[in-house]
Amino acid sequence: MSTIRKWFKGAPFGVQSHRFDVSAVHPNQKKFSTFTEAPYSRHHSVELSHIGPGTYNSKETCFSKKFLEQKLGAGWARAQEASRLTQLPHFHFQAIKKEREQQANKRGPGSYNIKDFLTELQKKPQSKRGLLSSGETRFRGLIGNYYPGPGNYGEKGNPYTQLEKNSWNRSHSDGLMCRLSSKPPPLSHQGSGLGPGTYTIKSDIETFVEKSTGTRGPYDIFSGERSSPVPYGHYSVQKKKPRELTSFKSFVDELNAPHKKKQGGFSKYPRDPKHPTERIYWTTLSQCPKDVNVAGPGSWLPHETEQKHVNRPPFLLASKRSGLKACQMLLGTWNPVGVGRYLNTTLMEKIDRRQRYRSLFMSEPKRYLHDLNRDKLLQERITPFTKGKCRPTVDYNSDPTP
């Protein structure tokens, strides 16, 4: 079992823990300005407590040869100059940088141009084809039989004319040896049509003299002096342009510009509108107050409450009168007698006890002789089936006839 290396000898009872470990001591019990004030740290107690002469290597300090070579490798002046040059923009983009700085500084009413959505849509790539365009040719020509009829083949409607010409050329052609070469026959000598002394032919010397040549020789590496500034590369210097008269826009031209057409004009909208024009402010009640005449929550009439009969407690007391159930529980009496303990007969006395027979007048059946056809039908239902028939009466109690 590996144990922690100790820097002291003679630990009592073979204990391997450190002697001044105060990490478990409460902070209120630690004394100030002593070792027990700070918790135990291996870095301060073990590693740094034994540093002394001869215990560390001087080659690893900041003045060692290896450290100085690393710091002085490329040169601090050259590194600083290179970092400065990398932050500078290329001279081709310096004009663009100045223009952007002026745009950032020159901000205010009328100093910028806000394009509407129609102008932005025109800048986007568009297609000439519409939504219903399929790209197919509208009229593709004749559909059906593409073969022409008789009399439309060959020269002047005769298809055998070309065949006769080919057979004639084969029979009257050149010999076999003449037809082997693919070169065309030599043309006859034709003149240019110019007379003597009407044109000038330049000699070889005149042609060589008029030939354009450069001023640099074969060993000229640079077309200029060595001390002149470098025209290209990272260390190049921008060439100064010759001073010319520049044309600046006058105040009248800027005022009549198309993006300043509506500036300075009177608006048709009120300066302080009652309701804001932007819909984003319509949700806030303080910025967009509601109209008083418009119906809304709380604009209707409240319901009328009915006045119910309430039996007030006697002698204008604030406490409620105890009910029958409370008297039975507290007093144990089933027939309480006292002020206000009798039955309230006020409601019973006001009941209307008159009897009305309204059902006679609200019945649906009609009176007699209201509808003659219907009354006749009802009379047939109650007519006996023996009406109009005279059957002999038989007395079953008497003797039968012989």
Swiss-Prot record:
Name of the protein this chain belongs to: Ciliary microtubule-associated protein 2
Pfam families, A to Z: SHIPPO-rpt
InterPro entries per the UniProt record, alphabetical: CIMAP2, SHIPPO-rpt
PANTHER family: LYMPHOCYTE EXPANSION MOLECULE
Disulfide-linked positions: none
Chain's gene name: Cimap2
